[in-house]
Amino acid sequence: MSDDHGHMMLVGSVARPEDGWNVEDVMRNAANAIGEHASMLPDGEIGDRYYWINYVARRTYAEHPDMKTLSHHTIDDWKPKGYDDHWLFTIADGVKEIAFDKIGYAGEAKKSYAIFKRLRDEGVIGQGVRFMVAIPLIESATRPFIDTTEHFEMLWRAYGNAIRREVKDICDSIPHEDLAIQWDICVEVAALEGLEGFTSDLSYLESDPMKRYCDALKWVCEPIPEGPWLGLHICYGSLSHEEGQGSDSGHFHEITDLNVSVDMANEGVKACGRSVQFIQVSVQFSNGFDEAYYKPLERLDVGDAHTYLGLIHLQDGVDGALKRMAIAGKYLSDFGIS
């Protein structure tokens, strides 16, 4: 049985920039709303991290002397319009290898953990609740931003090396019994779904997207000892979601069923090289009452990892979530919701 018995999970981002919340605001509100039902809480990925991988583009790639900006989105506060509006970089002529001193996730995690610990000591956050740190997996943080296959491979190695150091720093700085690390897996999903632009000839990297995804997980999990929880968030995106539209509007691709998510969960857990405590998979609102959508859960094989299903949608709230839970429960007996 997994150590994680949470009934509810916040995947990462919580507050919109216009809410004006800081880390403490996020944690106080989250603890008040779902604290007794959640086994871990994030810091809300506020500020630049709200725009997910664009945080890496703005803070790391755009400032690197060997990377040249070809284009970037034009919306204020660096918010992209959609999946075709990312920054785009190239690597300078003659450069064969690049390196990053840091990406920034370790520094953000350590600052947020200090607030988490204070709030827990004050009784705002319950004892035993863990602090969750969400980090983009390698392909998600690199492929949308780079101009050629050769440069993608160079950037893949550079980000991977840097993020391995950062997760080690996080594990060295935060008590293991207080920590949960989640890999955010999105572009890897797009590659497996066969989306245009995500299949190409590769020389250094494994060309099969599932093998490449598993190779990445094995590599970045090596610095994470047993003790901290480890989780996989298998994501179809929310970047293009607009207020007033359904939650499906944010997905880069319609999720017709959970086959790809189950495949990635099963293979990912085996690849990590250590125990995995939780898995989170997205649920398409438009297909959420279709029993066939959930049937792949029958072959979910993730050992003791606790599974969270993205069954909560703004369109129909609690009533809709309960109906989707009942359908999903026919194919998976034990799960939390997100």
Annotated model-derived regions:
Residues M1-W78:
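N-terminal basic, low-complexity leaders that serve as flexible interaction/assembly modules and, when applicable
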Residues S2-V14, H37-L41, G128-A134, D178-Q182, ...:
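Structural preference for beta-strand elements that scaffold enzyme active sites
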Residues G20-M27, I103-L119, F152-E166, S203-V220, ...:
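Well-ordered, non-membrane alpha-helical segments in soluble/globular domains
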Residues K79-P175, I181-Y213:
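Active-site-proximal, glycine-rich beta->alpha crossover segments in alpha/beta enzymes
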Residues I115-G128, E166-L179, D215-L230, E267-Q277, ...:
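A structural motif corresponding to the C-terminal end of an alpha-helix
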Residues P136-S140, D184-E188, C235-L239, V281-S286, ...:
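Active-site beta-loop-alpha junctions enriched in small/polar residues
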Residues Y213-S286:
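Long, well-ordered mid-to-C-terminal structural blocks that present hydrophobic/aromatic surfaces
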Residues N266-S338:
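Catalytic-face loop-and-helix region of soluble metabolic enzyme cores
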